[in-house]
Design a protein with these regions (language model features):
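Short, glycine-/Ser/Thr-/acidic-enriched flexible segments
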Residues: 30-31, 54, 75, 79-81, ...
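Flexible hinge/switch segments at interdomain interfaces of large molecular machines
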Residues: 12-18
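General beta-strand structural signal in soluble alpha/beta enzymes
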Residues: 9-12, 47-49, 63, 75, ...
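C-terminal catalytic lobe of FAD-dependent flavoproteins
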Residues: 116-117, 126, 145-150, 154-231
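Dinucleotide-binding Rossmann-like beta1-alpha1 core, especially the glycine-rich loop
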Residues: 1-11
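Flavin-dependent oxidoreductases
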Residues: 56-124
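Long, K/E/R/D-enriched contiguous segments that form extended
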Residues: 125-126, 130-134
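Helical element adjacent to the flavin cofactor pocket in flavoenzyme catalytic cores
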Residues: 3-4, 21-72, 76
């Protein structure tokens, strides 16, 4: 990590209720609040609700209430829904993961993410601990919530479970998001998707890449090219 230019250190003692071999610690980090972030951005935007796009062309979005025309169009719909171009239905697969909110328990100091695939994540918010984990291909694991509840009872036996959520993420074939032109035949239609478990990070990278493409016609972050080699 340090060779990539990020300040980090290896620590052996961590504030967790289970044993670890150690952890990579990143200093001077902040805890991100996505709703406050979105609310601040939305102040300068016009957001049209209850207007699902029924059909899409390169320059038009057609809805039940009318059409919207634009010189540049970005499809940022979690899953790219235009199938006749791009063929994203064969370039993406779905994964599901789970989160529980716990109260009446000690909240670890910091934000933690287990390195192994499907491992646990922990972060606090006020008097609540958010415990996430149990990742699997969608449709392959019928009792993901129950398995996460078992982990909660094991590591936080006194905690009260006050809420639960499931997330479904679009995964790419190589782990990097698809950002750029929707297809080779659509110079003014763009896409951002396949963020995996890193939606906020992927969204910020997409904003940088697509703003450059729309304004300057060039892409400065080549690894995210959609027509890249993935095997």
């Amino acid at each position: 990590v340090m060779q990539l230019g990020f300040p980090a250190e290896y620590v052996e003692q961590v504030d967790l209720p289970f044993e670890t071999a150690g952890a990579v610690r990143f200093p001077n980090q902040a805890q991100f609040h996505p709703l406050k972030f979105v609310a601040a951005i939305a102040k300068n935007l016009n957001i049209y609700e209850h207007s699902p796009v029924r059909e899409m062309t390169e320059y038009f979005a057609l809805t039940d209430h009318g059409s919207v025309a634009a010189e540049k169009v970005i499809v940022a719909t979690h899953f790219p829904f235009i199938n006749r171009r791009g063929s994203y239905f064969v370039k993406l697969y779905q994964e599901r993961s789970y989160v529980l909110s716990l109260k009446n328990t000690e909240i670890p100091d910091g934000i933690y993410l287990e390195a192994k695939k499907g491992g646990l994540s922990l972060r606090g918010y006020e008097d609540t601990l958010l415990l996430g984990g149990i990742t699997h291909r969608t449709g392959k694991e019928p009792d993901g919530f129950e398995k996460l509840r078992e982990q909660a009872k094991l590591y936080f036996p006194e905690a009260e479970i006050t809420g639960q959520w499931a997330a479904q993420d679009c995964m790419t074939l190589d782990g990097l998001p698809y950002i750029g032109n929707y297809s080779s035949s659509t110079p003014d239609l763009f896409v951002a998707g396949g963020f995996g478990k890193w939606g906020m990070t992927g969204a910020m990278i997409s904003a940088i890449v697509l703003s450059d493409l729309c304004r300057e016609g060039k892409m400065n972050l080549q690894p995210f090219l959609i027509r890249r080699e993935v095997f």
